[in-house]
């Protein structure tokens, strides 16, 4: 089993546990260059994206130049939190998709908490 498969398996286990809580999930995807986050509501018909933000958002693009990836992730989390508050979402479950809670993933979570999300 390689690293990606192991991360995927960890993520599936976590997703199954989070779905039982009934809360919306704050899902993180981390690529080599960008970081993406979505708040997803799960139900029997499937998943629905309620709010999203990433480093390729037009709102953030100009303010990200010259910043490290960790700083960029924090700004993405803050933008996601701001959009979630505007949509009436205050409580979520953090689905880190098998990634370690460290670096960019941690910075995104802390940025979202600063913006008022509770998880």
From Swiss-Prot:
Keywords, comma-separated and alphabetical: Ribonucleoprotein, Ribosomal protein, RNA-binding, rRNA-binding
TM helices/strands, residue ranges: none
Cellular component annotations (GO), alphabetically ordered: cytosolic large ribosomal subunit
Record's keyword annotation contains Oxidoreductase: no
The organism's place on the tree of life at top rank: Bacteria
GO biological process: translation
A GO molecular-function descriptor: structural constituent of ribosome
Annotated InterPro entries: Ribosomal_uL18_bac-type, Ribosomal_uL18_bac/euk
Keyword hit for Ribonucleoprotein: yes
Pfam families per UniProt: Ribosomal_L18p
Family to which this protein belongs: Belongs to the universal ribosomal protein uL18 family.
Entries under NCBIfam families matching the protein: L18_bact
HAMAP family hit by this protein: Ribosomal_uL18_B (MF_01337_B)
Oligomer status and interactors: Part of the 50S ribosomal subunit; part of the 5S rRNA/L5/L18/L25 subcomplex. Contacts the 5S and 23S rRNAs.
Function text: This is one of the proteins that bind and probably mediate the attachment of the 5S RNA into the large ribosomal subunit, where it forms part of the central protuberance.
Name of the protein in question: Large ribosomal subunit protein uL18
UniProt organism field: Legionella pneumophila subsp. pneumophila (strain Philadelphia 1 / ATCC 33152 / DSM 7513)
Gene: rplR
């Amino acid at each position: 089993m390689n690293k990606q498969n192991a991360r995927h398996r960890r993520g599936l286990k976590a997703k199954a546990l989070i779905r039982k809580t009934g809360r919306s999930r704050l899902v993180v995807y981390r690529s080599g260059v960008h970081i993406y986050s979505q708040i997803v509501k799960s139900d029997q018909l499937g998943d629905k994206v309620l709010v999203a933000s990433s480093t390729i958002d037009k709102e953030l693009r100009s303010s990200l130049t010259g910043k490290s990836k960790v700083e960029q992730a924090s700004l993405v989390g803050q933008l996601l939190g701001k959009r979630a508050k505007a949509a009436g979402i205050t409580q979520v479950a953090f689905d880190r998709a098998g990634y370690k809670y460290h670096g960019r993933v941690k910075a995104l979570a802390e940025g979202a908490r600063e913006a008022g999300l509770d998880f």
